[in-house]
Each structure stands twice: as C-alpha cells, then as structure tokens.
Amino acid sequence: MLHSGKKSVKISWGMEKILISGMGIVSAMGNGVNENLQALRCNCSGIAPLRYLSTAHKEFPVGEVKMTDEEMISLLQIPENQPTTRTSLMGIMAVGEAISNANLQLDKSNHKLKIALINGTTVGGMDKSEQFYTDFLTNDTKNAYIATHDCGACTEMIADYFGIFSQVSTVSTACSSAANAILLGAELLKSGRADIVVAGGAECLTKFHLNGFNTLMILDKEHCRPFDAARAGLNLGEGAAYIVMEKAKENSRSFEQGKEEIILAGAANTCDAFHQTATSPQGDGAFLAMKKALEEAGISPEQIDYINAHGTGTQNNDLTEGIAIERIFGANIPPVSSTKAFTGHTTSAAGSIEAVISILSLQNNFIPNNLNFKEKMPELSFTPNFNDVAVEQNGNLKPQKSELRHVLSNSFGFGGNDTCLIFSKN
C-alpha cells in the first residue's frame, strides 16, 4: 500500500461515492462528538498539566483524555480480569459512538454484511508494557503480558468487544496511521471487499512518547503555537476517533438527523523517505499527497474552503507544510488552521480525530481557530485562521465563511509518510 521514492497511492474513485454514515471521538476536548464540537466552537483547549500518566517529565503540558482506565472499564462494563489497554479502551468508546451514530445494529440483522474494522495505532498496549517492565524478569506470567500489548492485539480487543467485524486490520505508519486506515477502508469499499468499514485510530499517551519526543527536543513547555513565528514544539496528546464509511448507493440508514451528508471525496498517500523524523525542505511528500488527493477528488485547489493542517507546532513541520501549501494553492490559499492546540498531537490517532473535526466543520459551516497564534511566520505568505474576538455571547464561534463545501485534512508521519484526505458535502 505504501511506496517510497516520492510515489503515491491512487484510488480509482469512479462514480461511486464513499458516504460517511457515522463518527465517534474521544479526545482531550471531551468524550463524544457533541463535547468536541462545543469545545471547538468556544475555543476550549484540552491541553493541561499531566494528570494521568506517571512520568518524571511533569513540565510538559499534554492533551490527556479526562478519564482513568478504571473509569472507562466500568463505563464499558468490561470484566476486571479481562486484558485491556488504554488504547483499546478509548478505541472501544469511539467505535461505539460511531456505530450508534450510523444506526448500525449490533445484532444478526447484519450477519450477511462484510463489515471491516481498520485501526491505526503505533504504541498499542505499551502503557501496560511500561508498567510490567520492572517485574518482567521475576514474574512467571511474562508471556501473558506481552501477548496483549502489540498494536494488533489492541485492534482485536476493540473488534471482540462488538463482535460484528468480519475483517480486522491494523495500520501502523506513525502519525499518518489513522488517515491511512481511512484510505485503506475506502479501498476495501471500492473493490467490493467490504460493505461497511469502520476506520480510524486510537493512541494512548505513554512514557515512550514523552521520552522519545523529548529526545528529539521538539516538545513545548508551554501550549503549542502552530504556524507561529515563535513556535517552540508540540504538545503530545491521546485519543481515538473513527468514521463509518459505505458506498452511498448502498446506504439504507441516515446520518444524524438534520445533518448534511458528507463523503470522502479523495485521498492520497505518499512517501518521500527524506529523513527518519524530518520532512523535506520543500515539503515534497506533503505537496504530492495534496496534489494527488485533489486529482482523485476531481476538484481544483480553488474549491477547497478550509485546510485542517498537520500543524504540529515544530520548526520543521510548520515551515515545510506551509511551503507545500503555497506550492499547491499559490496566491489563493484558503483558511488554514491546526487543531492540535485543542487536542495535542495524538500521533497515530491524529488523522481520524482531525477527520472528525473536518466533518464537523463541514456540517456546521465553521472553521476552527488556530489557537495561541500571535506572530506571522516570515517565511510564509499566509497567516493561520485566528480571530481572538470570534466568540459570540452564547459561546459559539462565529462562522468564518457562510458555506463550506470541501475540506482538506493533512496527516504526516515519520519517514515521510504523508496522507491527505478530502471531505465534501454530497
């Protein structure tokens, strides 16, 4: 599916439309679609001091989901002796909402349908591995520990909880994982290998994240400032989000009443393989991903109404992504914002969390603010979407455009693995 040498994945979209029939999300902003929407509209960031993860690095603010593992286990009514991980628990919560949102029944009425779960994650159950590491050498059940901690095991835990999936796959491409899960899900639908796909990603915050990104010296000790001249790095986060996809002509259920139908209009994945952790100076992978996604969607750059940027807040990403955006859009750059200042960088889950945010933007005709922005980057011609007086008395963000029809969402992973998704009103 993924190729190096600045090549890209292409999907033959044809005349068939991929309908988004449901979605679910758990993030630092809140649990569920409604809580996340309200947080976006009132400029309420979920970034806060560390509370749930035990680590020596208390100096870094993060975007944690505001629930303990025990609270999620109780809410989901999972037996206490059943192996679980924080990643799988958040995934179950988000998949459950997506299934409910799509009016998908968890009974035998779906037994003839080919329903696939495509999950993007990288650390899997590493939160448990870190807890058990110290007694690994002396504990007789060491194999039981390891067996439930890999990426695929987390996906299986999510699938087993619902019992409706005939196909289960795990995608692990770092910070583009969830976006690639959505892309793979679309391919399964187009090829007829699945009738319904639940695709997205889940990732919990671990010491591995904090220690690794701290070693790279790209963590900000303050709230991150994407596309700001004084940006100093990213804030890590955690969460899960999934969308339910199916061919529009086969859909017999309705999306949430009163909401416009949204389709996945185009998608593309590229890999420029420039560096293990850095992007190419001219943003070649990002440029090619956006270019190919636009071609697959059959729309011009001028038709994009909003770009949900990868926008991590690091020196490297924001500059090279900005250059790639300028190469694609020229002098007609649409509003751009990064929502990672709301959620933190949720790494493998970022692509699907931001896919849900993009869909919410389309359904509600608003553009999320680029929080914490103060000073324009001198290297770029555009400034991100920021309006510090954009909150009305009722707490809702004033729409930045009267109508949104096409939203582009970027997700870029280490190794130059770049994915672009385009969502449109049907």
Where are these regions (language model features)?
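Conserved small-residue
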Residues: 22, 40, 95, 117, ...
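Alpha-helical metal-binding/catalytic segments enriched in His/Glu/Asp
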Residues: 182, 240-248, 355-359
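ACP-dependent fatty acid/polyketide chain-elongation machinery
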Residues: 7-80, 249-263, 356-370, 419-426
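Conserved catalytic cysteine-centered active-site region
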Residues: 9-14, 48-93, 124-139, 143-184, ...
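Feature captures the FAD/FMN-dependent oxidoreductase FAD-binding
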Residues: 87-110, 119-121
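Condensing-enzyme catalytic core mediating Claisen C-C bond formation in acyl metabolism
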Residues: 16-21, 44-50, 219, 223-297, ...
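Structural signature of cysteine-dependent C-C bond-forming condensing enzymes
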Residues: 11-14, 102-118, 133-143, 157-168, ...
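Short glycine/threonine-rich loop-to-helix capping motif typified by GTGT followed
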Residues: 274-283, 312-329, 346-353
